[in-house]
A protein has these predicted regions:
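Positively charged n-region of N-terminal signal peptides that target proteins for export
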Residues: 1-4
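Bacterial N-terminal signal peptides
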Residues: 7-16
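Structural recognition of the beta-strand scaffold that forms the well-ordered cores
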Residues: 34-39, 43-44, 86-91, 127-133, ...
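Conserved SGNH/GDSL esterase-like catalytic core that processes O-acyl groups on lipids
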Residues: 51-147, 151, 193, 198-200, ...
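Substrate-gating cap/lid alpha-helix
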Residues: 180-221, 244
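Histidine-centered active-site loop/cap adjacent to the catalytic His
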Residues: 228-258
Length: 258
């Protein structure tokens, strides 16, 4: 009798666990994961940036874009899903990851550089931090500006080069936001500026540095010409970015929590 009672209790317990597992929770019961973005023009939208109009925006003011509503942006589509919610948007049109953009070297605190503006950024309290940049580094700098791989003892002169700047950025985020998962998004069009994407050197550097820090690198598929206007994602391109990022986040977060 006692044995049957114990078995019955165990079965009820197992059933309760299975019913409350992430796979079986209703949309209203699921944990909402907050995400913060550090990005360039691809992630801007007027009035939605963390510091309002203090950040330069590309969307929707560009005369050539059809992204005329915030609902068309990749990150708003992600915000509209049941699992994720936008925490902070730190995106500045024309910004680079390194301190250098062509012949210009940014000073500490300048928001036009991901690295120099990190200490000034309000990241909120995110569960996820996504880095989506490198495009302006590719468009304005050369392979000579890649620099060497370096993972500690960073100097300000190091941060004028892409590799140490990108490593510093991830290192900073890991140290200052230990409870957040960090993801990097590698732009499409790897191999050349004419495609509106990254040079091979920058794309490969991102992959290597993400591997070093055990950061998930979401590599976007090539966005065809129909998905870009003036080298920037249009509505079609935004859908492609959203679908890839959404799929990668769900897959990676489920795998990591098992």
């Amino acid at each position: 009798m006692i044995r049957r009672l114990i078995i019955a209790i165990c079965l009820v317990f197992m059933y309760t666990i299975s019913c409350t597992s992430p796979q079986n929770l209703s949309k209203t019961d699921k944990q909402i994961l907050k995400f913060t973005i550090i990005g360039d023009s691809y992630s801007t939208y007027d009035g939605w940036n963390n510091k309002g109009n203090d950040f330069a925006t590309y969307y929707p003011t560009s005369s050539v874009t059809d992204v005329s509503d915030v609902a068309y942006t990749w990150w708003y589509k992600l915000h509209y899903t049941p699992e994720f919610q936008l925490e902070k948007l730190n995106a500045y049109s024309g910004s680079t990851i390194s301190y250098k953009k062509g012949s210009t070297v940014f000073k500490e605190g300048d928001k036009r550089s991901f690295c120099s503006g990190l200490s000034q950024s309000d990241m909120g309290n995110p569960d996820i931090i996504m880095i989506f940049g490198g495009t302006n580094d590719a468009w304005n700098n050369t392979d000579a500006d890649l620099g060497y791989y370096k993972y500690d003892d960073f100097t300000q002169s190091d941060l004028e080069y892409f590799r140490p700047a990108f490593a510093y950025m991830i290192d900073y985020l890991i140290r200052n936001y230990p409870d957040a998962r960090i993801f990097n998004i590698t732009n499409s069009g790897r191999g050349g500026k004419p495609e509106g994407g990254l040079t091979q050197g920058i794309a490969d550097s991102m992959e290597e540095i993400c591997r070093h820090y055990n950061v998930t690198n979401i590599i976007l598929p090539s966005i065809l010409d129909s998905g870009k206007t003036n080298r920037h994602p249009n509505k079609e391109g935004m859908v492609i970015i959203f679908e890839q990022v959404y799929s990668a986040l769900k897959k990676d977060l489920v795998v990591k929590t098992i």
